[in-house]
Amino acid sequence: MKILITEDEAIVAGELEAIVTDLGHQVVGIAGSSRRAFKLAETTKCDLAFVDVQLSDGMTGPAVARHLSEDARATVIFTTSNPHHVPADFSSACGILIKPYSEHSVKSAIAFVVDCMETGRSLRRKPRALELSPAYAERWKMS
């Protein structure tokens, strides 16, 4: 799985990168701003993206998520300590992983979302730390 990390805190981005690569996935880039994320979306292909709501250039994560989801066809997971800043429609993202998160919660979220992406439905229990958008809960038959 090719994964893009959009996170402006270098330590957090590095930890997330280590977790992703430890699971055997490829990190195609790390962006700290919406501008960098849009550039990476043009030059790389990602299947999954972790997108912080608040980036170095402001509250731009929702715009990045919508672009990645709708234009680049990536599945997006928001990472944020402020879930109330996520729009009601989740900006087309599949869900939210609330900070601070543990290594276990990231690994569980990735495994769950990858299963859903590959099969079109959930094969395992949704991780407690992952809040799914209503659209993805319906799509992945999480009634």
Each predicted region: which residue ranges?
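Receiver (REC) domain switch/active-site region of two-component response regulators
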Residues: S102
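A Lys-centered signature of the CheY-like receiver
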Residues: K99
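Short amphipathic alpha-helix used as the core "switch/output" element in two-component signaling
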Residues: M59-A74
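Acidic, metal-coordinating helix/loop segments flanking the phosphotransfer/catalytic sites
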Residues: E17, I30-L48
